Amino acid sequence: REFLQNAIDACNTRAALEWSWGTEFLEMEEARALNSMRNPYSPQISIQYNSETQRLVFEDNGIGINARDIEQYVAKIGVSFYQSEDFSTQQLHYEPVAQFGVGMLSGFMVARALLIESRKDKSVNTAWNVTDRQTLEPVTAKWIEGAETMEYINSNREQSGTRITLVLRPKYAKNLSLQRLVH
């Protein structure tokens, strides 16, 4: 469930940033007029499970993450991006679903391996964070049971968003219900 919550928040963050991108210094009416001419962002989240390979995949077209985000938020248990200064400086007006930074912990508990493929969306570089421009380079990180750290490998992901693949431990794979996962 934590991965689904993260996907929802990633899409909500991108939607809020896309709405505000380029409108930081406009009055509300001008911002609405500008946004009505843009192609609207359409959030997409998918969850897939293959019982033969015991792979559970969460994918979204949200804000995405980069290597810095993985180091500062994903790889640290109990640290949440949505409670960070990085999030608050974006000045977004919505309440994130995930707040506790336990998503990856839950992944490490149920998976034998975990793969993160992501690319950060351009909308993170708004006027609100001109002093800390985010890299938009795609990133792929993998963790295999027994490893102490995540290993980074080359990525050629072109689309903004994140795909997380978990290779489940057999005892969790046999009891998996996508229906229960989303409700």
Where are these regions (language model features)?
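Hydrophobic side chains in beta-strands
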Residues: 49, 60, 82, 116-118, ...
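Glycine-rich/acidic phosphate-handling loop/turn and adjacent ATP-lid/helix
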Residues: 51-93
